[in-house]
Amino acid sequence: MFQAETVCLKQIQSTLRCIDFSKECTIEITSRGLRFAVEESQSLQAHAFLDKSLFQTFNFQGDSDGDTYMFQTMISPLLQSLSIYTDGKERISTSAWDQPTVNIMHKRGVICKVQYNGPGCPFIWEVEEMAGYATACELLTMECEDDVDINRLASTLCTKIIMKSNWLYDALVELDNNMGENLIIHTSSQKSTFLLRCVGALSTTEIEYPNEKSVLESFETDSENTYSYRFSLIRHALKALQVGSKVNLRIDENGTLSIQIMLVGQEGLCTFVDFCIVPLDLVSEDEEEDEEEEPAESNQSDNNVLRNDPNYRGDAETEDEDS
């Protein structure tokens, strides 16, 4: 059984909106918090983590600390329900509600109760006001078809970069205007450079960051590396980069890219969103293998590329120490 209460509705909604691009969402509840995961095209997994510190009360009943609840549902109805209280202009036109902080929620007596009673039960979010109004959202849940591997990167990292998220956002938006299909990321340990390139039909655009503390808070790369990624997958991270504070870019030895973004709320509480993207060469290899397999076999092997690496590891909520 899981029960919790929170007044951080604005921050929770802003975080979950960053991964609201897939119909189905896998939710994992542990004693440390809630993790929401979505995926696309067997090449992208996005995770949003809500730490237990966002909740005023957090009651997770399990036999041990390692116990979890995992199920699938849709989060779009939940976001629509929360928008009644977080999108000020839709509810009331006062300036106070244009920026509904945690303190305002306390003053108005707005509190959200979250409940999940186990397999087969709905995932319930109920928002109550001191005035007596209440909004309940019951999300139907389904068992996960496969165990969702929440670990993302291999143990060996070849590149790690920490910078302001809005700087990366501005660069990606400019590159996206080039109408290219792929994003190329190049790092060099000798030249200490971090370069982004997009090749369009009419021109090529490059943006290079020098290894300076005023630009890159942290820059680590073991050698000269160049990887290419589908821009259509990178675009899913733009919403989080636009509202984020810092971004932690990591590339492992297989070329898998992790874009981990820290979102800081008005009360100083942090949430994390992580986008894990497979490079184009791995995507091509996986597609070729699917074409070579017999139809009967291919129907039995529809596994996500991101789950095939047994050395995958890393939790989004622990990266705030690095940031």
UniProtKB/Swiss-Prot annotation:
One Pfam family matching this protein: Rad1
Subcellular location: Nucleus
Ranges of compositional bias, category Acidic residues: 284-296
Amino acid composition bias (Polar residues), ranges on this chain: 297-306
GO biological process, one term: mitotic intra-S DNA damage checkpoint signaling
Record GO cellular component, one term: cytoplasm
Keyword tags: DNA damage, DNA repair, Nucleus
InterPro entries per the UniProt record, alphabetical: Cell_cycle_checkpoint_Rad1, DNA_clamp_sf, Rad1_Rec1_Rad17
UniProt xrefs under SUPFAM superfamilies: DNA clamp
Spans annotated as Disordered: 284-323
Disulfide bond annotation, renumbered to this chain: none
Keyword Transferase: no
Similarity comment: family membership: Belongs to the rad1 family.
Role summary: Recombinational reparation of DNA damages induced by UV and gamma radiation.
Protein name: DNA damage checkpoint control protein rad1
